[in-house]
């Protein structure tokens, strides 16, 4: 179905949150919502922005009935307050000095979410959102070193997924490149929790270094 409403703006990401479809604009400046339970209908006044440290919006995720708007360097959390007009309100104090480096690199995982990113002037790592105001790095030095071999443009196309097998939970992060071997790094959340250290391994397709193909 094509969206024909004149108030719809070009968008890169979308989430469903309490009856609303929440979009972020391609220019990374604003977020806007559909009418309640009407995904094809929009009001030009139903928009907002990240305000604590308004960097460019990269992606978003709904977790624990809250909407996290993840910028290039920071993350702000919104809740649905209903009422007339724009229904989302920033939660006071729910602010993290870490952002996303790829719009495809955030995934729900083990009662929270993981993301590919970092803070201002930081190199790319992989993080776990520990609370509404704190992110904890889960990638170790070896994984970080391998990630740094990819360019910013390549990292911007990196993507993630999660799965469980035999009672263990895994998050998969794939970085593709035409210059160097592509890589797929796997975080074992269950083993990490039991050992107290981040446990990583790698998936490959074929006999040579290559990213994993599902």
Question: What is each of the regions a protein language model found here?
Answer:
Residues 3-7, 14-20, 53-214:
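Beta-sheet-dominated scaffold domains
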Residues 25-41, 77-85:
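Blade/loop signatures of beta-propeller domains
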């Amino acid at each position: 179905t094509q969206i024909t409403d004149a108030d719809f703006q070009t968008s890169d990401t979308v989430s469903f949150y309490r009856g609303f479809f929440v979009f972020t604009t391609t220019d990374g400046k604003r977020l806007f919502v559909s009418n309640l339970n009407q995904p094809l209908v929009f009001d030009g006044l139903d928009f907002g922005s990240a305000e604590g440290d308004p960097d460019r919006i990269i992606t978003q995720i709904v977790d624990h009935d809250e909407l996290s708007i993840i910028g290039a360097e920071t993350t702000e959390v919104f809740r649905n307050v209903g009422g007339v007009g724009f229904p989302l309100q920033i939660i006071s104090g729910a602010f993290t000095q870490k952002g996303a480096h790829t719009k495809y690199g955030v995934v729900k995982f083990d009662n929270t979410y993981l993301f590919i990113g970092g803070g201002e002037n930081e190199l790319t790592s992989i993080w776990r959102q520990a609370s509404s105001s704190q992110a904890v790095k889960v990638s170790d030095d070896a994984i970080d070193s391998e990630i740094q071999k990819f360019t910013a443009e390549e990292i911007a196309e990196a993507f993630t997924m999660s799965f469980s097998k035999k009672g263990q939970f895994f998050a998969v992060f794939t970085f593709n490149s035409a210059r160097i071997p592509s890589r797929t790094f796997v975080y074992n959340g269950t083993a990490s929790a039991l050992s107290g250290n981040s446990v990583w391994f790698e998936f490959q397709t074929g006999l040579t270094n290559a990213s994993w193909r599902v």
